[in-house]
């Protein structure tokens, strides 16, 4: 009990100190010019980076979600038990989860940016991030599907429903809270990612004209400001906005899961 109490206190104090430090140093530096439509060296606006982050998140999730959920459905509902291919996919997914983001960035730079000739672009960054979060979505969806009782499937088959109808009408609805949690986790990782995007999306602090334009997300914007050493106040202000976004994502996932569970 004592060790548990110490662990809880240490975790709460560490989190409180981190959040407090960022808020104290960042809130006083939040000024209207930081939300100017165009970035300049005078205003160091974060608005283009914020909009780029939204586009990057949407595009990466649009790519990753169908593949992640589809793969999980196949492994749980269609593949035979003990299938070696399924085991290989699971091991691969677990391995991909532990790979540092810088490695994903190097892969994205060599494959998407150079080999596929996409250049430093929104699309190259989104494709790299979709590969990065694919194991998260796939594994959480798989666990959510496995948590659905087999009696649901047996009852559906007993009433004459086919496999496809059973999966989409009977199995998926109870699994939606777990699937949503995985998507929210993926979203949080995308929003906070820096290393992979430096090598694939670039650091241009302007809104993209199209998916082949170089972009800078909020996390990369904060890194660029702090690394230059001339915009530390603006970097702290950016950290506050990024922290608020991540907290809202986490709170939103909890709220959505509770609402879905009610129905």
Task: Briefly describe each language-model feature range.
Residues 60-93, 106, 254-258:
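Transmembrane-helix boundary motif in ABC transporter permease subunits
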Residues 100, 159-160, 173:
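Glycine/proline-centered hinge or cleavage motifs at structural transition points of membrane proteins
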Residues 42, 197-243:
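Interhelical loop and adjacent transmembrane-helix boundary motif
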Residues 61, 163-199:
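Transmembrane alpha-helices
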Residues 94-129:
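Generic hydrophobic transmembrane alpha-helix motif, especially the helices
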Residues 1-20:
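N-terminal signal-anchor/first transmembrane alpha helix
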């Amino acid at each position: 009990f004592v060790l548990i109490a110490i662990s809880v206190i240490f975790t709460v104090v560490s989190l409180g100190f981190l959040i407090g430090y960022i808020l104290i140093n960042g809130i006083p530096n939040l000024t209207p010019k930081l939300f100017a439509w165009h970035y300049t060296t005078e205003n160091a606006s974060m608005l283009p980076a914020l909009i780029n982050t939204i586009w990057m998140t949407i595009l990466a999730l649009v790519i990753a979600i169908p593949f992640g959920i589809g793969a999980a459905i196949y492994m749980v509902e269609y593949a035979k038990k003990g299938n070696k291919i399924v085991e290989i996919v699971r091991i691969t997914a677990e391995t991909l989860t532990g790979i540092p983001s810088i490695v994903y960035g190097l892969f994205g730079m060599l494959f998407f940016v150079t080999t596929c000739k996409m250049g430093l672009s929104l699309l190259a960054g989104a494709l790299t991030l979709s590969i990065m979060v694919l194991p998260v979505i796939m594994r959480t969806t798989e666990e959510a599907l496995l948590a659905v009782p087999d009696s649901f499937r047996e009852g559906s088959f007993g009433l004459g429903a086919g496999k496809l109808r059973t999966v989409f009408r009977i199995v998926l609805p109870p699994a939606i809270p777990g699937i949503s949690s995985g998507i929210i986790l993926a979203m949080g990782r995308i929003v906070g990612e820096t290393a992979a995007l430096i090598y694939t999306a670039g650091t241009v602090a302007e809104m993209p004209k199209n998916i082949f334009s170089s972009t800078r997300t909020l996390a990369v914007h904060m890194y660029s400001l702090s690394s230059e050493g001339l915009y530390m106040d603006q970097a702290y202000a950016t950290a506050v906005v990024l922290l608020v976004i991540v907290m809202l994502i986490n709170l939103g996932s909890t709220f959505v899961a509770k609402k879905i569970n009610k129905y």
